[in-house]
């Protein structure tokens, strides 16, 4: 398969994905953003606790 054929197929795939995809509703988008921020905060807190624990144990 040539490079030009691959690019053509890739472009067709992108068109198909865009035609099938739909824009999320405002409520769904807000919920996804809140959930993402919550998970990031939890991971950050866990990382801080681990770092603090290691620092106190090594000090």
Swiss-Prot record:
GO terms for cellular component: plasma membrane. Keywords: Cell membrane, Membrane, Protein transport, Translocation, Transmembrane, Transmembrane helix, Transport. InterPro entries: Prot_translocase_SecE_dom_sf, Translocase_Sec61-g, Translocase_SecE/Sec61-g. It is a single-pass membrane protein. It comes from the Archaea. It is found in: Cell membrane. GO terms for molecular function: protein transmembrane transporter activity. Its main location: membrane. Signal peptide: none annotated. The chain crosses the membrane at residues 37-57. Belongs to the SecE/SEC61-gamma family. Essential subunit of the Sec protein translocation channel SecYEG. Clamps together the 2 halves of SecY. May contact the channel plug during translocation. HAMAP family: SecE (MF_00422). This is Protein translocase subunit SecE.
């Amino acid at each position: 398969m040539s490079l030009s054929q691959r690019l053509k197929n890739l472009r067709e795939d992108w068109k198909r994905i865009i035609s099938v995809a739909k824009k999320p509703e405002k409520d769904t988008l807000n919920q996804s953003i809140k959930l993402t921020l919550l998970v990031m905060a939890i991971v950050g807190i866990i990382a801080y606790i681990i770092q603090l624990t290691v620092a106190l144990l090594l000090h």
